[in-house]
UniProtKB/Swiss-Prot annotation:
Named cofactor requirement(s): Zn(2+)
Name this polypeptide is given: Cysteine--tRNA ligase
Protein species of origin: Burkholderia thailandensis (strain ATCC 700388 / DSM 13276 / CCUG 48851 / CIP 106301 / E264)
SUPFAM superfamilies: Anticodon-binding domain of a subclass of class I aminoacyl-tRNA synthetases, Nucleotidylyl transferase
Binding residues annotated for Zn(2+), in chain numbering: 30, 214, 239, 243
Superkingdom of the organism of origin: Bacteria
Keyword Protein biosynthesis: yes
Length: 465
């Protein structure tokens, strides 16, 4: 098998992957700030790095995969106050929702999933080291800030110079920072903040800044110098740049060898965002599309390329995944292990070792599917199923998927409000004793892949079948 090459954002080039310890990989990925439901951009990030860790394990590495949870943050505090609930109640609720969404997408749980609030002592310890090393200072407002100008290599990840950054910076007169570019390590508590938002420290009661959370958790769990750090492209600056400044300022050594960033999800060629109103939660998407279809939609594009979200692209992903399942419908794969000497497997491995090029790897799956359709050969069916499994695909019984996909196609991906409108029409028909019409609507919905279940008290629930 060819050696793995990874595009390293720090080097701005593909590099041979050489782990610090032979046969072992330590990888940290920035996770979710849990104050709302996860969106399709989060889905892309977790699926991308799920595939990275799956391939590293398939290549024989012993992987320690850490993906954190940010459970204290300004957004969390604001949302808890708006909702009139505790921070702990809010974060617990959205952690549960996050896990349900990621499980649905077939994302394997990380080896370690630390919560920021469990690592406050380690964060304070790192801040004290930075202060001792001359990188941190306490401002007049009580915040502890990082002095960016003290770190000579600031900007090495993003390619941004301090001069260019300062030219674009505007700072309010009340700002207590020594420099507009300095960033907060420890935020002094404010009287209006709710219980559970601060911890005691030598700097006074307060809470950690976002950037120090990941530095402290990464260094504590993986060591002060580890192999891979990943996250979305939007985290490259300032978050990951600041992580480097903090970690290397505290330890005096290289923080991470390989930095990986997945591309944006776009809608109509614009980055998906709440402010533009083109924002879709995972839950909303899963109301319309099977979770494996969504995963396939993400996987078939290279992780660094923009991913264009639309119903047209998801419908096409469903049709493409249907082709792969159809190839397995009437052929039982044999029970032998994956044969890496086989030509398709070698091309698949070459694609994955070329910076996790899932777009090419998926093309190999379609080549295999064509051969399976032509030969009906169980050994080739096994290769198809095993290789797809490395991407988290084709794990279901083909007939089950195909039946569901056919129903979804018949619906034309019916919107939930359209389904509810038909249910309301059925209720009205029953109230008018027009049972033939009520039965017709039920049958029509079932034909469209929607099953109804009448509940005691007169309510009706629906599900896709």
């Amino acid at each position: 098998m060819e050696s793995l090459r990874i595009y390293n954002t720090l080097a701005r080039d593909k590099q041979d992957f050489v782990p610090r310890q032979p046969g072992e990989v330590r990888m940290y990925v920035c996770g979710i700030t849990v104050y709302d439901y996860c969106h399709i951009g989060h889905a892309r990030m977790v699926v991308v790095f799920d595939i990275v860790q799956r391939w590293l394990r398939a290549a024989g590495y012993r992987v320690t995969y850490v993906r954190n949870i940010t459970d204290i943050d300004d957004k969390i505090i604001r949302r808890a106050l708006e909702n009139g609930e505790t921070i702990q109640s809010l974060t617990r609720r959205f952690i549960d929702a996050m896990n349900a969404d990621f499980d649905a997408l077939g994302v394997e749980r990380p080896d370690i999933e630390p919560r920021a609030t469990d690592f406050i002592p380690q964060m304070l310890g790192m801040i004290e080291k930075l202060e001792a090393n001359g990188y941190a200072y306490q401002a007049k407002d009580g915040d502890v800030n990082y002095s960016v100008r003290k770190f000579a290599n600031y900007g090495k990840l993003s390619g941004k110079s301090l001069e260019d950054l300062r030219a674009g910076e505007r700072v309010a007169a009340k700002d207590a920072k020594d420099d507009p570019l300095d960033f907060v390590l420890w935020k002094r508590a404010k009287p209006e903040e709710p219980a559970g938002a601060s911890w005691e420290s030598k700097y006074g009661a307060g809470r950690p800044g976002w950037h120090i959370e990941c530095s402290a958790m990464g260094c504590t769990l993986l060591g002060e110098h580890f192999d891979i750090h990943g996250g979305g492209q939007d985290l490259q600056f300032p978050h990951h740049e600041n992580e480097i400044a903090q970690s290397e300022g505290a330890t005096g050594q290289t923080f991470v060898n390989y930095w990986m960033h997945n591309g944006f999800v776009q809608v109509d060629s614009e980055k998906m965002s709440k402010s533009l109103g083109n924002f879709f939660t995972i839950r909303e998407v899963l109301e319309k599309y099977d979770a494996e279809v969504v995963r396939f939609f993400i996987v078939r594009t290279h992780y660094r390329s923009p991913l264009n979200y639309s119903d047209v692209h998801l419908d096409d992903a469903r049709a493409s995944l249907t082709r792969l399942y159809t190839a397995l419908k009437d052929v039982t794969p044999d029970a032998a292990p994956l044969d890496w000497s086989e030509a398709h497997a070698q091309r698949f491995a070459a694609a994955m070792n070329d910076d996790f090029n899932t777009a090419v790897a998926v093309a190999v799956l379609f080549e295999l599917a064509t051969e399976v359709n032509r030969t009906r050969e169980p050994a080739l069916a096994r290769q198809l199923k095993r290789l797809a499994g490395l991407l988290g695909l084709l794990g279901r019984e083909p007939r089950e998927f195909l039946q569901q996909a056919a129903g979804a196609a018949r619906t034309g991906a019916l919107e939930p409000d359209e389904i509810e409108a038909r249910i309301a029409a059925r209720v009205a028909a029953k109230q008018a004793k027009n049972y033939a019409e009520a039965d017709r609507i039920r049958a029509e919905l079932l034909e469209a892949g929607i099953a109804l279940e009448d509940k005691p008290g007169g309510s009706t629930e629906w599900r896709r079948v």
